[in-house]
Amino acid sequence: MNSFSNEEFDCHFLDEGFTAKDILDQKINEVSYSDDKDAFYVADLGDILKKHLRWLKALPRVTPFYAVKCNDSRTIVKTLAAIGTGFDCASKTEIQLVQSLGVPPERIIYANPCKQVSQIKYAANNGVQMMTFDSEVELMKVARAHPKAKLVLRIATDDSKAVCRLSVKFGATLKTSRLLLERAKELDIDVIGVSFHVGSGCTDPETFVQAISDARCVFDMGAEVGFNMYLLDIGGGFPGSEDVKLKFEEITSVINPALDKYFPSDSGVRIIAEPGRYYVASAFTLAVNIIAKKLVLKEQTGSDDEEESTDRTFMYYVNDGVYGSFNCILYDHAHVKPLLQKRPKPDEKYYSSSIWGPTCDGLDRIVERCNLPEMHVGDWMLFENMGAYTVAAASTFNGFQRPTIYYVMSGPTWQLMQQIRTQDFPPGVEEPDVGPLPVSCAWESGMKRHSAACASTRINV
């Protein structure tokens, strides 16, 4: 395998016949001979490209603006910038990151309805004009700090069927929307469109239909007030892995007819979205090492459900936890499932087990209960679908460092990226033949891992 670090990408370029699985196994073998068996990620950039092609096919009218907050790793942002996505930034720092990679301000939306004045001024000074708002106070701030801004009115949605609800904090009602549009007109601030977010982990695609219908109402209000609105932002909430009840294409099959009904292609309205986890969740797999182990009595398991515990119960402590990558358990309603790096014997007995992080906090529990064969200090566990809302919010609490990320890319992936960069595929094109691209996509048929039966099973998306 050749490891390249050039001006644009710092990753392992896979020789023909090698996969992301090989990189993971190679890294485990390398560190197994050292004392520092630190946790690490393998991130497959081919998986991200595959998601992009899938997006173009499923939502041909919708331009993706990647939600940087989801995973702000520089290599990820570089990759998405190279293939032409826009960017949803929530702060000055995210804008700086994106623009440092040469992304023009026209490909950025400052999608935070509540912004610090100094950061509004920063956006103004650096050419970022598109930004969201949902209150009169925000209008007044923008009028003073960035009078040439192109504002997008964030409306509230029914997010009652989402895992992570957002409308409790953001979004104007339809009644308030008219008042805000009238106030914006008085302030001579240009409102160019409407945005919404149905919530992360949306389980009912009809929520998108209602939100798109509501956006149409606000467009009509804007026309009555005197605005020529031309941008619709349908937000995020798209799944990033396949282990979900509602698949990506099930959602898009509902969105597309709604867009055609309320914003037909000849309406002149540009449509964007803010996918985050969709692009990165399945690209990342985390490898953690068991640093300690305890055999405990039933009443000492730390489980909230003692009835299913057995007399022989194990507690395993690993070198990443909820203050690190697994913060998604606390903040993103995630449920994670460990996979075993070593193949268990066919007749191996399984025991009730729990998995804990390395910090001194009793809150640092990753999996409350699962069935595992007896593991040992130095053994490895793998966690798939760990690319979204993990590394971005990880801390160094107790002095534990964030895991290193090893990026991989196959030759066909690199070639296709160059083709996209030079030809700038427009939305709606037929998906190019990626040939052997899937060999570099993490955790497909080439990587069948051994799954533990756990009470906590999946990451919500």
From Swiss-Prot:
According to UniProt, where does the site described as Stacks against the aromatic ring of pyridoxal phosphate and stabilizes reaction intermediates lie?
H197
Question: Which parts of the sequence carry N6-(pyridoxal phosphate)lysine?
Answer: K69
Q: How is its activity regulated?
A: Inhibited by antizymes (AZs) OAZ1, OAZ2 and OAZ3 in response to polyamine levels. AZs inhibit the assembly of the functional homodimer by binding to ODC monomers. Additionally, OAZ1 targets ODC monomers for ubiquitin-independent proteolytic destruction by the 26S proteasome.
Q: Which residues form the active site?
A: C360
Q: Which residues bind substrate?
A: Y331, D332, D361
Leader peptide range in chain numbering: none
Name the GO terms of the biological process aspect.
putrescine biosynthetic process from arginine, via ornithine; regulation of protein catabolic process; response to virus
* Transmembrane annotation, as ranges: none
What is its cofactor?
pyridoxal 5'-phosphate
The EC designation for this entry is 4.1.1.17
Q: Which reaction does it catalyse?
A: L-ornithine + H(+) = putrescine + CO2
Q: Which GO terms describe its molecular function?
A: ornithine decarboxylase activity; protein homodimerization activity
> What pathway is this protein a component of?
Amine and polyamine biosynthesis; putrescine biosynthesis via L-ornithine pathway; putrescine from L-ornithine: step 1/1
Gene Ontology CC annotations of this record: cytoplasm
Q: Which UniProt keywords apply?
A: Decarboxylase, Lyase, Phosphoprotein, Polyamine biosynthesis, Pyridoxal phosphate, S-nitrosylation
Q: What class of enzyme is it?
A: lyase
Which InterPro entries is this protein grouped with?
Ala_racemase/Decarboxylase_C, De-COase2_C, De-COase2_CS, De-COase2_N, De-COase2_pyr-phos_BS, Orn/DAP/Arg_de-COase, Orn_de-COase, PLP-binding_barrel
PANTHER family per record: ARGININE/DIAMINOPIMELATE/ORNITHINE DECARBOXYLASE, ORNITHINE DECARBOXYLASE
What function is annotated for this protein? Answer: Catalyzes the first and rate-limiting step of polyamine biosynthesis that converts ornithine into putrescine, which is the precursor for the polyamines, spermidine and spermine. Polyamines are essential for cell proliferation and are implicated in cellular processes, ranging from DNA replication to apoptosis.
Member of which family?
A: Belongs to the Orn/Lys/Arg decarboxylase class-II family.
Q: What is the protein's name according to its record? A: Ornithine decarboxylase
Source organism: Bos taurus (Bovine)
Q: Which gene encodes it?
A: ODC1
